[in-house]
């Protein structure tokens, strides 16, 4: 093999092995990182705890661990109403999905989330969250209900038992859920939520949501 080719071959092998080593080291570092959870308050009576697929209602504030500066406050959005989201399906960062598992309604937590469970090397929000940032969240959970895609919830919404959900049925369900946090929404807000639900789920455009369209998690038999 000519010297030039031999050198090039060794050069390529070196960088391949270096890349493999770097990737393995990064994977090892990420595997040692974990979400740290501090329970600030937990109600004495806790008969129901949060799990993947549940619908949660919570407020949370986010801070940069580096300097303690606040980058997010849920109370400044949606007229101060707590946020509704489904746990464990990617509606929040992975670290929050982990941190809010096994929580009771009324519980408060302070959690530390490493970059690999937050925004990683990319950062977020045009520099508001820099690359490789460790985040701190203070969380207060208000309600844990059956996820919107569970069998039980589908049957609860389907008032006439025709195995499809109409706009009237879902509108009534939303109204009941919004009333649970004792902060009734304006009708225009509820209408916007209803429109968004059908836009994202009524795939055939027939004005109803079928069991197949409803069950996006594909793990329940309807």
Swiss-Prot record:
Motif (Retention in the endoplasmic reticulum): 219-222
Reaction(s) this enzyme catalyzes, per UniProt: [protein]-peptidylproline (omega=180) = [protein]-peptidylproline (omega=0)
Protein known as: Peptidyl-prolyl cis-trans isomerase FKBP7
Domain of life of the organism encoding this protein: Eukaryota
Gene that this polypeptide is encoded by: FKBP7
Enzyme Commission code(s) on record: 5.2.1.8
Binding site for Ca(2+) 1: 158, 160, 162, 164, 169
Ranges where the EF-hand domain occurs: 145-180, 189-222
Organism: Homo sapiens (Human)
């Amino acid at each position: 093999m000519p010297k030039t080719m031999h050198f090039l071959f060794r050069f390529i092998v070196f960088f391949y092995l270096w890349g493999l080593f770097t990737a393995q080291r990064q994977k090892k570092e990420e595997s040692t990182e974990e979400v740290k959870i501090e329970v600030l308050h937990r109600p004495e009576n806790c008969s129901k705890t949060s799990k993947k697929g549940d619908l949660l209602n919570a407020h949370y504030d986010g801070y940069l661990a580096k300097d303690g500066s606040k980058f997010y406050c849920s109370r400044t959005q949606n007229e101060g109403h707590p946020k509704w989201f489904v746990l464990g399906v990617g509606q929040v960062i992975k670290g929050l999905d982990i941190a809010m598992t096994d929580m009771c309604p009324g519980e408060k937590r302070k959690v530390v989330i490493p970059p690999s469970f937050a925004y990683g090397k990319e950062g977020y929000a045009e520099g508001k969250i820099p690359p490789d940032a460790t985040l701190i969240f203070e969380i207060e959970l208000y309600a844990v209900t059956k996820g919107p895609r569970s069998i039980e919830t589908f049957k609860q919404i389907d008032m006439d038992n025709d195995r499809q959900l109409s706009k009237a049925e879902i509108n009534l369900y939303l109204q009941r859920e919004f009333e649970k946090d004792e902060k009734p929404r304006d009708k225009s807000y509820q209408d916007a939520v209803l429109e968004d639900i059908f836009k994202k789920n009524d795939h055939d455009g027939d004005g109803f949501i079928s069991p197949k369209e409803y069950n996006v998690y594909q793990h329940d038999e309807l």
